[in-house]
Amino acid sequence: MTAPATLTAAQQHAADAVITSLAGPGARLRDDQLTAVSALTAPGARVLVVQATGWGKSAVYWSATAIIRAAGGGPTLIVSPLLSLMRDQVAAAHRGGLSAATLNSSNIGEWSAIEERLRGGDLDVLLVSPERLANPGFGRRVLDALAGNLGLLVIDEAHAVSDWGHDFRPDYRRVADVLRDLNPATPVLATTATANARVTADVAEQLGTQTLVLRGPLARKSLHLNVLDGLSPIQRYAWVAQSLPALPGSGIVYALTVADADRLVDAIRAVHGDDIAVAAYTGQLDADRRHELEDALLHNRVKALVATSALGMGYDKPDLGFVVHVGSPPSPVSYYQQVGRAGRALDDAVVMLLASATDDRIWEYFATATIPDPDKMRDLITALDDADEPQSVVCLLYTSDAADERP
């Protein structure tokens, strides 16, 4: 598939209206973004964009949506993996002059009204999670109605589609069913920042044999990566507390555990009191509190959020000045995703990793803590296999406990 070199005057006007609303007067699509948008104006286009965080992948699908809607096309369906990411995308779409909504577990009471708006043509963009996409009821109510009238399908974080991906999610496989049932003229865009060559090839193959792959360098020139290892836990806390005032702007300090995040916040407050505003951000907070803290960081009301991995993919603050890791992330891909929060709209941002030999033991614990005991599992399977009738959970647990007591 060869991408058209330019947009028509009407298409360019629609794209410019979105970009200037999002990025200010005079903002325009870059040539590499324009290539992707131009390709998506062709009926049946299949485009895979593999670009670094901060490249502006969302600008591509907002612009393409505006062009398609201006030409009388149907709405855009975006498959997105995180509630926080969907919330930010809805807000961005509104800033770009597009009507958008999401169907997720936090707004069940709004589903009927949103689906009615969708059927009435009042929505430009609908965002759903892969889990919602895999729900049979959602398929009957929404997908069947949309399949013949969808203007654009966007698969965000598309590496999760691939069996070879670092973050494979089985529910993303439902995308293949959606693709099969789509009107063949519906364009499809898949985006990711963390796909190696094998994952890229796998995702492209699932999209179709004529997929246009637009892959750029994943290095971020604005990020200055530093590593300081060999510090004890107390020394790492001290480094953060002492260095925080000198770090540029506001940012994120990543901790490996909830307890570490809470202790580090206490350590910073012990040194600076109320002079440096910080807060802990973990998965144990309710959605409203997490949203409140995300907004506080976005508008620089805090110097830093001390966060677990609960704050990661999908959080978009273009002027985030630094990311500090107190402990090594579980993988290079996780590290790349987390440091990618910084410096999106800055020439320079600071990234610091405070590594320790004990970090590997923490991740080994996380990886094995939920694995059941092999002997107990064998006993349970044997009990099920030997039973002549259905067994209650209580009976099965008794069987397992009795086996533990055997000499």
Q: How should these model regions be labeled?
A:
Residues 7-48:
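Conserved pre-motif I regulatory segment
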Residues 41-42, 47-48, 52-55, 66, ...:
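Helicase motor core with emphasis on the C-terminal RecA-like subdomain
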Residues 60:
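Hydrophobic positions on the alpha1 helix immediately C-terminal to the Walker A/P-loop
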Residues 63-90, 96:
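Conserved SF1/SF2 helicase motif Ia
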Residues 372-390:
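Short amphipathic alpha-helical interface segments
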Residues 389-397:
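Short acidic, hydrophobic short linear motifs in intrinsically disordered regions
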Residues 398-407:
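Single conserved hydrophobic/aromatic residue that forms the stacking wall/gate
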